[in-house]
Structure formats: C-alpha cells, structure tokens
Amino acid sequence: MSESLIAIVPAAGIGARASLPGEAAVPKQYRPLAGQPMLRHAVRALLADPRIVQVRVAVSAGDGWVEQALAGLPRTVWRPCGGPNRVDTVAAALADSGADADDWILVHDAARPGLPAAALARLIDACLDDAVGGLLALPVADTVKAGRQRVSRTVDRDGLWLAQTPQMFRAGLLRDALARARAAGLAVTDEASAVEAAGHAPRLVAGALRNFKVTWPDDFELMEKWL
C-alpha cells in the first residue's frame, strides 16, 4: 500500500504581533522576506523534499494575496478553508485534502520560512516508521522564569522542548485528535497538543535554530539573514 505525504500550511491568520504601529494591514505571511513573500519561502522549504507529493495552503475566503504569492510553484494548491482558529483551519484543510487514513500529514507554520531541508528530511525519516508520528523541536537552553511583571519562580528546564513545525501524523490519527479537541473546546496551539490530548506521545525530532517562528517585528530582520 502506498502512503502519500501531504503538507498542510494554515495561512488564514493576520499575524498582528508582527506589525509595527501604523503599518499597512498586509497579513504577516505575505510580507516580503529576501524579495519574496514569507509564505512562498515556507512552501518552497516543504517542496525541497520530493517525498511530499503536495502542499495544500489553507487561506481565508476572499484572500487577495495567495495567488500571486505562490504563482508558479509545483505541487502546490491553495484552498479557502481557513477557520476562526488554527484547529478549525487544519481540520478543514485535512478534510478538503481527501487524504486516506494511512497517509502522512505534515502541518507547517507559514511563519517558519527558514525550515532547512536537512531538518525536514530528519523528521520524515524519523516518523515514517513511528506508530504515532512526531514534530521538530529544540531543547530549552535558556533559564526559564514564570511570572507576570515580576518573577514568581524559576522553572526546571530539564526535559523541556520548544515545539516547531512541521508536525507529522497519519491523517486518520490527526483527524480524530482534532475532532476530539474541537468537541472538548480545548485551546490547542499545535497539532501535537491535540494528539497528546487524545492519549498519544508524539516523537521529538531535533529541529533547527533557523526554523524559528517569525512573530515580532525584529524577527523579519533576523530571518532575512538566514534566507
């Protein structure tokens, strides 16, 4: 039985934290980096591995930027199935994909344009024979503090990881986990959280520093240096 690898990129958000006061309301994923929209870099990073048969980009209805941003890219489609939050968008994109239960789904953030080919290959290689699937992640290196305006405590960083994307799971398992999370009203911020809540333990695969999420205005300058 042939199992396809399909990538999903949720790109229906606006990325308000990445904008400076007074900047035009261009969604973060379409802002330029190294002369191209950030979303295009993220999709091209996925296309670098020929095992991924298709990249499916989930956008908001009426999105006026995606066609130009992704023009000419092979194995790439975009669909207006963006929802009010990430879990809804990914669930809709997964349903729209028509993936079989045993197909592999890789969900990748549009705001991670610096994904190295080696890290992507490492994730795929590690997960293809895994019963659950997994995600790219980095061990926490800094001292971690908890608190608001003042420190309330120092958190033991031993065993703590910073989750990255892609996150790779079989379509059937991911579909079930997302449905459970939505039904329970869980505030999951990534697919691994939904899979964990469904009783599974995703595999941790070494990520990469340059695969950070572009979140704040200064992040654009830093990512430019990588690209």
From Swiss-Prot:
Coiled coil: none annotated. Keywords: Isoprene biosynthesis, Nucleotidyltransferase, Transferase. Gene3D superfamilies: Spore Coat Polysaccharide Biosynthesis Protein SpsA, Chain A. The record marks R157, K213 as: Positions MEP for the nucleophilic attack. The record marks R17, K28 as: Transition state stabilizer. Pathway: Isoprenoid biosynthesis; isopentenyl diphosphate biosynthesis via DXP pathway; isopentenyl diphosphate from 1-deoxy-D-xylulose 5-phosphate: step 2/6. PROSITE patterns: ISPD. InterPro entries: IspD, IspD/TarI, IspD/TarI_cytidylyltransf_bact, ISPD_synthase_CS, Nucleotide-diphossugar_trans. GO terms for biological process: isopentenyl diphosphate biosynthetic process, methylerythritol 4-phosphate pathway. Its EC number is 2.7.7.60. GO terms for molecular function: 2-C-methyl-D-erythritol 4-phosphate cytidylyltransferase activity. The keyword Lipid metabolism does not apply. It catalyses: 2-C-methyl-D-erythritol 4-phosphate + CTP + H(+) = 4-CDP-2-C-methyl-D-erythritol + diphosphate. Belongs to the IspD/TarI cytidylyltransferase family. IspD subfamily. PANTHER family: 2-C-METHYL-D-ERYTHRITOL 4-PHOSPHATE CYTIDYLYLTRANSFERASE, CHLOROPLASTIC. Catalyzes the formation of 4-diphosphocytidyl-2-C-methyl-D-erythritol from CTP and 2-C-methyl-D-erythritol 4-phosphate (MEP). This is 2-C-methyl-D-erythritol 4-phosphate cytidylyltransferase. It comes from Bordetella parapertussis (strain 12822 / ATCC BAA-587 / NCTC 13253).
